[in-house]
Amino acid sequence: MSRKLIPVLLVLAILLTACSNPSTPQTVEVTRVVEVTRMVEVTRVVEAPAQPAATVAPATPAPAPPAPQAPGFGETLKKVTARGKLICGVNSQVPGFGFVDSSGAYAGFDVDFCKALAAAIFNDVSKIEYRPVTAEQRFPALQSGEIDVLIRNTTWTLVRDTDNGGNFVATTFYDGQGMMVPKSLNATKLEDLASGTICVQKGTTTELNLADQMTARKIQYTPAVFDDANSTFAAYAEGRCDAVTTDKSGLISRRSVLANPDDNVILDVTMSKEPLGPMVRQGDDQWFDIVKWTVFATIAGEEFGVTTANVTDMAANPKTPEMRRLLGADEKVDLGAKLGLSKDWAVNVIKGVGNYGEIYDRNLGPATKTAIPRGLNSLYANGGLLYSPPFR
């Protein structure tokens, strides 16, 4: 007889017994059925035990696939290397930052970051074409591809970061807007300029900030707007306005070349925050990374004490694991390859232009005419805002 029929026959037998003896409580019989059923089920389990699943050794996880790349990824570096030079949009009218020196060569703090980028790509700071652009020309020049990168005392703002087809990569100089006046005016605050005329350059955050500040303080004034920096400061020097406004660094550099610098004072007022830095065209993340990490390499160089004079020795005998990675001395790690550059790209940058501190001192330090105190542009360890993300 099939074992599967046993529970059924037992149930039938119990039901028949219950019908023939109605005085017997049915609850007892139900209990017996449950007990029998349980016994049968246990028997079945014992007779047909479940087989344990075979143990399988964990497989080695497959490497993660590379992140998908946007259509424009790598196009700028290909274009620059095929051309054999970098086209850098710069200012030609701000001493200390971007100007043409007495020998006819471009020089300045911003210009040196163009050179740093050329060193990272070509290991040659001379492979650059400088393209001077005004405040109004700079964004169209970047959008159209006329220039590869814009490094021209440009303030990082939300609108510029979203509406102009470009991305800011890092802040190279922390500044703030100021106001310069003739000492003879005896002005000490913005309110002293009420009903006056103020020279300002068109197409700049300076023009917008001036309007914001004077409106907030309810000061009536007349703006005298000019197309470029030279025209703006020429008008001030000629006495066509009572004051001139731009970034404080620009005021300091411009005052240094006036006929009588000491006859002019910069008011003790800061009208805005002005983080200045390079800008690249949107759509090429590799190029964005190259420019960004070139800036950080100069800052890290100063943090680690790597200079133009000792970079070769430091690369041969790096003192820390991070310095080893930065200078391409780690046999297992090639950070340059992540950027599409050579393994020693950061060595080439520091060898070509120096670390951030060297760049600053050469163009804006105490031995220069401009002589701008570092202030916020000091390393974080020295009370400033500058530090590099980790090189790892």
Which sequence ranges carry the predicted segments?
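Bilobed "Venus flytrap"/periplasmic-binding protein-like clamshell domains
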Residues: 87-96, 106-121, 155, 175-233
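C-terminal functional modules
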Residues: 332-392
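Sec-exported extracytoplasmic/periplasmic mature domains
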Residues: 81-85, 118-126, 143-147, 155, ...
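Extended ligand-binding regions for polar small-molecule ligands
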Residues: 66-71, 115, 119, 184-187, ...
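Short, hydrophobic alpha-helical packing/hinge segments within bilobed ligand-binding/sensory domains
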Residues: 76, 113-114, 137-142, 229-235, ...
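Acidic, polar ligand-binding/catalytic clefts
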Residues: 115, 119, 123-192, 249-270, ...
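Intrinsically disordered, low-complexity Ser/Thr/Pro-rich tracts
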Residues: 1-75, 79
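Extracytoplasmic small-molecule ligand-binding "clamshell" domains
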Residues: 69-150, 341, 356, 379, ...
